[in-house]
Amino acid sequence: MSEIGERVKKIVVEHLGVEPEKVVDGASFIDDLGADSLDTVELVMAFEEEFGCEIPDDAAETILTVGDATKFLEKNAKS
């Protein structure tokens, strides 16, 4: 997993309280990790803060899995 992927995983574990081994690229935030819509909004805000970038609403709607978040942030992260 990339350095950005590891940071994404850490945020997901902290915010959703899931076991680290469940946080894999194909894991759906809602279906696999038990997030609700508020959790997903909070995750997006945490990603924005951690990586110093803005995630527009239309992009946030396409970030459904851990891998989606990692790919988006690898392209758009400022830090």
UniProtKB/Swiss-Prot annotation:
Carrier of the growing fatty acid chain in fatty acid biosynthesis. GO terms for biological process: lipid A biosynthetic process. Pathway: Lipid metabolism; fatty acid biosynthesis. Keywords: Cytoplasm, Fatty acid biosynthesis, Fatty acid metabolism, Lipid biosynthesis, Lipid metabolism, Phosphopantetheine, Phosphoprotein. It comes from the Bacteria. Residues 2-77 form the Carrier domain. PANTHER family: ACYL CARRIER PROTEIN, CARRIER DOMAIN-CONTAINING PROTEIN. GO terms for molecular function: acyl binding; acyl carrier activity; phosphopantetheine binding. This is Acyl carrier protein. It comes from Rhodopseudomonas palustris (strain HaA2). The lineage of its organism: Bacteria, Pseudomonadati, Pseudomonadota, Alphaproteobacteria, Hyphomicrobiales. GO terms for cellular component: cytosol; membrane. NCBIfam families: acyl_carrier, PRK00982.1-2, PRK00982.1-3, PRK00982.1-4, PRK00982.1-5. 4'-phosphopantetheine is transferred from CoA to a specific serine of apo-ACP by AcpS. This modification is essential for activity because fatty acids are bound in thioester linkage to the sulfhydryl of the prosthetic group. SUPFAM superfamilies: ACP-like. It is found in: Cytoplasm. The keyword Lipid metabolism applies. The modification O-(pantetheine 4'-phosphoryl)serine is found at residue 37. Belongs to the acyl carrier protein (ACP) family.
